[in-house]
Amino acid sequence: MRATVLGAGSWGTALASLLAGKGYTVTSWDKDAAVLDDIARNHRNERYLPGLHLPPTLHASAEVAKALEGAELVVLAVPSHAVRPVVIEAKRHVHAGTPIVCVAKGIELDTLMTMTEVVEDVLPVPLHPYLAVLSGPSFAKEVAKGLPTAVTVAARWERIAKQVQDAFHTKTFRPYTSGDVVGCEIGGCVKNVVAIAAGISDGMGFGANAMAALVTRGLAEITRLAVRKGANPLTLSGLAGLGDLVLTCSSDLSRNRTVGRGLAEGKTADAIQRELGQVAEGVRNARSARELAKRLGVEMPITEAIYRVLYEGLAPREAVTALMMRETKPEL
């Protein structure tokens, strides 16, 4: 099989390495020439996955047309804000029948579309049925190291979900299939916002009780938004919902949790992301998820609080107090 991965960041490179490790011929494309040169010459990506050796069947190209030539599988692994321009550039070189796997997590701010909705907005209609989402508790570094991981692959066509599942399945990477694309997308996007809240809680020393409350109530508001968008609530109890949320809220590998800890220390989100050197999607997603919730009439108090901390200068401790002092109500 020939596969193309658009985006050579940590997640794109980890998935490209996984596919190449199965013996597929894989080409990585990116805007960053230095990263592509490192992959092509040294079989490494020291910027995003330092110290890891990449398979020799993983190649690199700076030209979209060349990278997509003959591709039987396309993986879209760019940051959420880059999805639309990259798909616009790539669409002439993708053909009907080729599965397109979106692993970007976000809601486009201008349109409030999920990532698959953005892709469908750009691609010709005959390509829409071949679109799939891969999401779940999966840090790139651990996948690249071959540590056991389970994810969800969602597509409207069961055949496409199964095809993508088979393409990615290895002895250390286990995909489950689903038909709930929107549930997987909302779960994968909004958990990043809750993870910022988790980082703030940890950074301020609020303890295990607070963390358990955040994860539980965070899942509740993620589920409300997803269901309003048409998702199956059970999806949010699975890998793409609860699984991804628990991982992102609890691990030091989480960039969004790191942002929260930095905010608790008095740093700005911009300064924290500069230190990280990578995108923390929750910073953007706090704005877009809040706007989508307002449009759909969904109450999302944790998301609202994080938005106010990031964009209105609300002190993290005041945000916590505001959450705790909201009007009391039944849990369910």
From Swiss-Prot:
Please classify the protein's predominant subcellular localization into one broad category. Answer: cytoplasm
Statement: the UniProt record of this protein carries the keyword NADP: yes
The reactions it catalyses are: sn-glycerol 3-phosphate + NAD(+) = dihydroxyacetone phosphate + NADH + H(+); sn-glycerol 3-phosphate + NADP(+) = dihydroxyacetone phosphate + NADPH + H(+)
Q: Name one Pfam family in it.
A: NAD_Gly3P_dh_N
The cross-references to NCBIfam families, in alphabetical order and at most eight, read: PRK00094.1-2, PRK00094.1-4
The places in or outside the cell where this protein is found are: Cytoplasm
Q: In which pathway does it act?
A: Membrane lipid metabolism; glycerophospholipid metabolism
The function of this protein is: Catalyzes the reduction of the glycolytic intermediate dihydroxyacetone phosphate (DHAP) to sn-glycerol 3-phosphate (G3P), the key precursor for phospholipid synthesis.
Q: What is its EC number?
A: 1.1.1.94
Binding-site list for sn-glycerol 3-phosphate: K105, G136, S138, K191, D244, S254, R255, N256
Do the record's keywords include Ligase? no
For this record, an example GO cellular component is: cytosol
UniProt-recorded name of the protein:
Glycerol-3-phosphate dehydrogenase [NAD(P)+]
Could you say which residues bind NADPH here?
Answer: S10, W11, K31, K105, A140, R255, V279, E281
Cysteines joined through disulfide linkages: none
Q: Name one GO biological process term.
A: glycerophospholipid metabolic process
EC class (word): oxidoreductase
List the catalytic residues. Answer: K191 (proton acceptor)
Describe the family membership recorded for this protein in Swiss-Prot or TrEMBL: Belongs to the NAD-dependent glycerol-3-phosphate dehydrogenase family.
Keywords recorded for this protein, A-Z:
Cytoplasm, Lipid biosynthesis, Lipid metabolism, NAD, NADP, Nucleotide-binding, Oxidoreductase, Phospholipid biosynthesis, Phospholipid metabolism
| InterPro entries in the record | 6-PGluconate_DH-like_C_sf, 6PGD_dom2, G3P_DH_NAD-dep, G3P_DH_NAD-dep_C, G3P_DH_NAD-dep_N, NAD(P)-bd_dom_sf
Q: Per UniProt, what is one GO molecular function of this protein?
A: NAD binding
